[in-house]
Amino acid sequence: MTTQIRFGGYQGAASVHTRAIAVFARALEDRLGDAVAVEVTANVGQLGHKAADLLQLVERGAFDLCYFSSSYLAGRVPALGVLDLPFAIDDRGRHHAALDGALGTRLEAGVAEATGYRALAFWDNGIRHLSNRARPIHTPADCLGLRLRTQHNAFHQAVFRALGFEPVAIDPSELPAAVESGRIDAQENPLTNLVNFGIYEHHPHVTLSAHLFGVALVLVNRERHDAWPEAVRAGVRAALAEATAAQRAFAREDDVTCLARLAQAGNQVLELTAPERAAFAAAIAPVADVERAKLPSDLLQLLRTPE
């Protein structure tokens, strides 16, 4: 009997996530042969859905797997809030190690307890930076009054409001149009999205703020997963481990190639100096401190010191 596995995404072919899904599909079919058939829908937007619809589509079983920003589930799984703390970690490798260790185990348990998913992997959702159409951003004062697109996450909105932005929550599928129309003045995303979504064509000013390391959870419908034969569950885990290693490599590579693309296109790219970055961290500290106080202290320690 062949197990059908449907994997949904919301980005195009060049996306680090879409490319990782292809690695997963090949790895799983190489392991299990005709025992599985993987069907990939790279962009549910082409089916008329918003990106955020993927979460419901997986939870109700229309898809088996998807990737999605952890920030969208933090309201249901409070422990995921540890991944939203800005300026919390400076080392990408250490961040990955924490997610692959005890921190990841805790977060997986939280997701399974509070939702209809299991979190099977933690993908690199990019180091997030600022871009805008108005002016160079060196200080929080430069942010004042700019309409900035955020994810649908109340803490994110509070953080950017503390910097002087006017936050506007917009689905990823609607972001390119919002940028092109001028509905928003600024946004924050990894460089790969800045390029692949065409944002850089309308936002000449890019600030390498590195304010957040994004995490994309690979989520599976829990009931569907638990009903799969053990060999399929084990194969999915093994194939995802291979895909995760590839995905993280893609993310690192895209930072380099996208930065070169911005330089070639003539975008003004500036990197915050250490004092400038400290000024941003100080501006959002009161908001971040409130959020940090809600989290178990040992969870914060697992983020800082991977086990």
Residue spans for each PLM region:
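Hinge/lid segment of periplasmic solute-binding proteins
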Residues: 100-113
